C-alpha cells in the first residue's frame, strides 16, 4: 500500500536555498546583520558557556522570568520559540482548521501562504500597491467581506512598507472581534519604528504580538523569537510547545543581548543613518 501524506501537503511548494555555501555571503533581502558584534560581547558570551550547558537539559523558566521582566509583562503572557515563524506556526496549530480564512498582505512574510496551505486555510491576501493605496481602509473592507479566522499583519510590512499606528491596530482588533477573528501583529521590525501593539494585549482579547531577535538584535542564525498575548491564548500555545522550546546556548545569548541592549540600539541608529 502506498503511503500518502496529508492532502494539504501536495499544495505546498518550497524553493531550496540558492546558496550552496554561506561563507562570505549575506542575504540582504532578509536584512541580516552585516556588522561584527563587539569583541567584548563575543568574549563574554564564550566565557559564559559551560560544559554543564551542553550536557544538561535547559532550565527554561529562568529565561521566561528574565525576558518577561525586560518586557514588563507577566510570565504567563509570554512564549518563546524558534524565530518569529515559530510563533506563527503555533498560532496556526492551535487555532486554524481547514476552510478557515486568513488575511495577510501580499507581498509579505513568505511563511504566511505556506502555513495557510499546510493547514488547509483559505488565503485571502491584500495585494499591496506602491502608490496611492489606502491600506487601512482596504484591510477593514477585507475583514468585513471575508470574516476571517485570522488576520496576520506584519507591522511594518516589507518589502512594500505599509504600517498601522496604534489607534488603527486597536480598531482592526475590535472590528475583527465582531467576527471571532484573531489578529497577529508581526513586529519583526518593531525596534526600527517604535510602534508596538504590546500595550494592548491585556485590553484586546484577540490580539497576538510576535517578535524576533533576528533583525534589530542581529542574531538570525540562532533562530530565537517570542510571542506575547493574554494568558489564555499563551496557555493554549504553551500546551503544544516542544518539551524545551529554547536551548541552553540561546538562553545565555538572550541574556547577554538584553544585558547589552545598547548594541542593538546603536545598530538600529546606524541603519537609520544609512537609509
Regions found by a protein language model. Name each.
Residues 74-78, 99-101, 187, 205-206:
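Short acidic capping loops at alpha-helix termini that bridge into adjacent secondary structure
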Residues 206-275:
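PLP-dependent aminotransferase class I/II
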Residues 94-153:
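PLP-dependent aminotransferase-like
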Residues 104, 125, 185, 209-211, ...:
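Hydrophobic residues in well-ordered beta-strands that form the structural core
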Residues 131-146, 159-219:
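Active-site pre-lysine segment of PLP-dependent enzymes
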Residues 31-34, 84-85, 109, 155-160, ...:
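Short glycine-rich anion-binding loops that position phosphate/pyrophosphate groups of nucleotides
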Residues 2-83, 90:
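N-terminal small-domain helix-loop-helix segment of the aminotransferase-like
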Amino acid at each position: 500500500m502506498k503511503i500518502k501524506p496529508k492532502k494539504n501537503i501536495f499544495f505546498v511548494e518550497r524553493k531550496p536555498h540558492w546558496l550552496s555555501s554561506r561563507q562570505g555571503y549575506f542575504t540582504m533581502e532578509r536584512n541580516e546583520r552585516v556588522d561584527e558584534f563587539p569583541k567584548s560581547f563575543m568574549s563574554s558570551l564564550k566565557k559564559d558557556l559551560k560544559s554543564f550547558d551542553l550536557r544538561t537539559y535547559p532550565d527554561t523558566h529562568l529565561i521566561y522570568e528574565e525576558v518577561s521582566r525586560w518586557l514588563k509583562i507577566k510570565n504567563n503572557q509570554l512564549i518563546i520559540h524558534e524565530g518569529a515563524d515559530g510563533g506563527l506556526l503555533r498560532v496556526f496549530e492551535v487555532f486554524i482548521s481547514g476552510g478557515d480564512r486568513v488575511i495577510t498582505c501580499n507581498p509579505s512574510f513568505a511563511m504566511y501562504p505556506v502555513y495557510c496551505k499546510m493547514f488547509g486555510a483559505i488565503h485571502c491576501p491584500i495585494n499591496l500597491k506602491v502608490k496611492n493605496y489606502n491600506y487601512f481602509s482596504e484591510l477593514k473592507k477585507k475583514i468585513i467581506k471575508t470574516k476571517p479566522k485570522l488576520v496576520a499583519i506584519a507591522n511594518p510590512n516589507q518589502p512594500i512598507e505599509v504600517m498601522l499606528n496604534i489607534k488603527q491596530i486597536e480598531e482592526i482588533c475590535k472590528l475583527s472581534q465582531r467576527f471571532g477573528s484573531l489578529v497577529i501583529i508581526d513586529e519583526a521590525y518593531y525596534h526600527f519604528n517604535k510602534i508596538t501593539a504590546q500595550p494592548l494585549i491585556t485590553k484586546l482579547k484577540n490580539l497576538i504580538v510576535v517578535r524576533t531577535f533576528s533583525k534589530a538584535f542581529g542574531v538570525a542564525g540562532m533562530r530565537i523569537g517570542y510571542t506575547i498575548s493574554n494568558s489564555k491564548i499563551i496557555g493554549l500555545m504553551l500546551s503544544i510547545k516542544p518539551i524545551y522550546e529554547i536551548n541552553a546556548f540561546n538562553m545565555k545569548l538572550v541574556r547577554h543581548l538584553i544585558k547589552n541592549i545598547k548594541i542593538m540600539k546603536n545598530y538600529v541608529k546606524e541603519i537609520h543613518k544609512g537609509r
